[in-house]
Design a protein with these regions (language model features):
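C-terminal alpha-helical cap of glycosyltransferases
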Residues: 114-136
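Short His-centered aromatic/hydrophobic patch
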Residues: 51-56, 69-70
């Protein structure tokens, strides 16, 4: 269940009526009081806060924010979604630089829609919000399990991860599937789960919000490591690229000394040792496959942050 907290201005009877109609169809809570808002955030810990119009409250960092401007003029850059009441309002918000704008009409204002249709569309937006940036929603068990599953998938043999199993049960299969799909590693994750004898992930269609110009990365398996480092340098770090480098390092098709010479020729020494450190952390590559020692330096810190943030809006 998605926990939605509506917050709205006092003395706005139309918005109050609209929210209560939604609450009859979508399980949620609502308040127009700043103190009650703080209490609900602390005690109930909502997944989504849906702001309706202008409210005098401080942002709650742990929840995902959706806003219905109701006439407010802003780009709302820090919101997951902006809900316009009409296509005209949506166009005006886009002119202000708004993104992730959805049009959901208010049945109290227009007869073009009814409340059931409106509630269904609203719930779809809430689900898209919760499908977005899935890594941020991972619990510690999922974060612990992911490298082991991927490593088992890469090697195709659970003996490579015997000292790390049993791993925690997958309690977030949907989030894990969405994450793997967006990172281009779903087939590998499926293989790892099969190797470990774990329950397959449900392959269900989903919609989510993505950063502008984001494209699901594709595998470059078979490419040489220097080319993959060049790809990271130009386009940023991704899980699939780490997997591809891991696969290349454990293959018999390269010579460590020759590889290090090519890395140096292309001025990728610092990048390479940092990428090795990330592979060690994220995929548990065994030390025997390292052609040189990984390093945890300032570039590693940046790459680590980029890997966690590149799906964020």
């Amino acid at each position: 269940m998605i926990k939605v907290l509506h917050v709205y201005p006092k003395n706005d009877s139309l918005t109050t009526r609209f929210i209560h109609l939604l609450m009859d169809r979508i399980e949620s809570k609502a308040t127009s009081n700043a103190d009650e808002f703080k209490r609900l955030c602390r005690e109930w810990q909502p997944d989504i806060i849906h702001q309706h119009g202008s409210v005098d409250i401080k942002r709650h960092a742990d929840a995902r924010w959706v806003v219905s401007p109701n006439g407010l003029q802003s780009s709302f850059d820090d919101c997951y979604a902006v809900i316009a009441r009409s296509h005209l309002e949506a166009d005006a918000l886009r002119d202000l630089g708004g993104k992730r704008i959805e049009v959901i009409m208010n049945p109290l204002v227009t007869k073009q829609v009814d409340i059931d249709e409106t509630a269904k569309k609203m719930m779809k937006v809430y689900q898209k919000v919760m499908n977005s940036c899935p890594y941020d929603l991972f619990d510690e068990a999922t974060k612990t399990s992911l490298p082991v599953i991927l490593k088992a998938g890469i090697h195709g043999d659970k003996r490579w991860v015997e000292h790390e199993i049993p791993i925690p049960s997958i309690t977030q299969p949907r989030q894990l599937f969405i994450f793997a799909s967006l990172e281009g590693i779903c087939p590998l994750l499926d293989k790892g789960l099969s190797v470990l004898g774990m329950t397959p992930l449900p392959h269900e269609p989903f919609e989510c919000y993505l950063p502008e110009n984001y494209a699901i990365p594709s595998s470059t398996e078979g490419a040489n490591i220097v080319n993959m480092l060049d790809d990271i340098h130009r386009h940023g770090i991704t899980f699939i690229r780490l997997v591809n480098i891991y696969q290349a390092l454990i293959s018999d098709s390269h010579d460590d000394e020759e590889l290090l010479d090519k890395v140096e020729e292309n001025d990728y020494n610092e990048l390479f040792v940092s990428v090795l450190q990330i592979i060690k952390e994220q995929l548990h590559l065994d030390e025997g496959f390292f052609p040189c020692a990984p390093e945890n330096n300032s570039l590693t810190k940046k790459l680590r942050a980029d890997l966690q943030n590149h799906l964020r809006l």
